[in-house]
């Protein structure tokens, strides 16, 4: 019980962000959902995540690694590999295979003073490349507000439309992020990802390294690291 109380206290303190990424999949977003934010033109991201049992359709702890690049601030593409635990020809069990998937995101409408930004995206679209556990098309809206001076509060809402019967992403999702003006490199977030609730935080170190950690329904903990830089200036 004390551990859960401390986690809850940490999560409530932690709802903040100008660092923008759907951390678990290597895309722009919150912890495990996309947002309609976009990175700056020419931004490259690469990294890896620990994904415990319960975060994926698999019944084992695993992880992924990814690369991501944003073109012209309206088009973003990423490619990721999720490690699969299998049995090798000699009977040894280990992470010998990978589930490969990609994401493409297009922003037809940038956020304005009175309207949200809009992004349309697709995850894992190619049916001939595997089981397509993350196969979805989605639309998402994000609107940010300035509160208490220059603090930033952002609200996100969206909907997943699965493109196959195996997809683990389906239905509505949404989240909130809060970024204090005194330290924009710190991020605290809470979200519903269509299957469960996630609460956590992220921070950027030395301008290029971002770390994140979050809990899924207070049952497991996920985290990761990523490197980001601008290839075009």
What are these regions (language model features)?
Residues 1-27, 233:
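Cleavable N-terminal export/targeting peptides
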Residues 193, 205:
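Acidic surface patches and DE-rich sequence motifs
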Residues 206-207, 228-230:
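Short, solvent-exposed amphipathic alpha-helical segments in soluble enzyme
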Residues 21-137, 142-149, 159-161, 180-186, ...:
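Transmembrane beta-barrel domains of Gram-negative outer membranes and organellar outer membranes
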Residues 153-187, 191:
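A mid-sequence, solvent-exposed acidic-amphipathic segment
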């Amino acid at each position: 019980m004390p551990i859960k109380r401390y986690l809850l206290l940490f999560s409530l303190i932690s709802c903040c962000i100008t660092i923008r990424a759907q951390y678990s999949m290597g895309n722009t977003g919150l912890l495990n959902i996309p947002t309609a934010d976009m990175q700056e033109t020419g931004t490259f991201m690469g990294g890896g995540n620990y994904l415990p049992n319960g975060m994926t359709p698999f019944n084992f702890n695993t992880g992924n690694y990814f690369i991501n690049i944003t073109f012209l601030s309206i088009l973003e593409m990423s490619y990721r590999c999720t490690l699969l635990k299998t049995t090798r020809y000699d009977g040894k069990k280990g992470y010998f295979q990978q589930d490969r998937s990609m994401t493409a995101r297009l922003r037809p409408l940038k956020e304005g003073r009175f309207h949200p930004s809009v992004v349309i995206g697709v995850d894992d679209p190619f049916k001939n490349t595997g089981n397509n556990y993350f196969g979805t098309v989605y639309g998402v809206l994000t609107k940010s507000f300035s509160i208490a001076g220059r603090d930033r509060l952002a609200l996100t809402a969206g909907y997943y439309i699965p493109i196959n019967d195996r997809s683990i992403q389906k239905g509505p999702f949404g989240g909130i992020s809060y970024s204090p003006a005194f330290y924009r490199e710190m991020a605290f977030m809470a979200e519903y990802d269509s299957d469960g609730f996630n609460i956590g935080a992220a921070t950027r170190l030395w301008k290029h390294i971002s770390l994140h950690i979050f809990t899924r329904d207070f049952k497991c903990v996920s985290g990761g690291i990523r490197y980001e830089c601008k290839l075009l200036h």
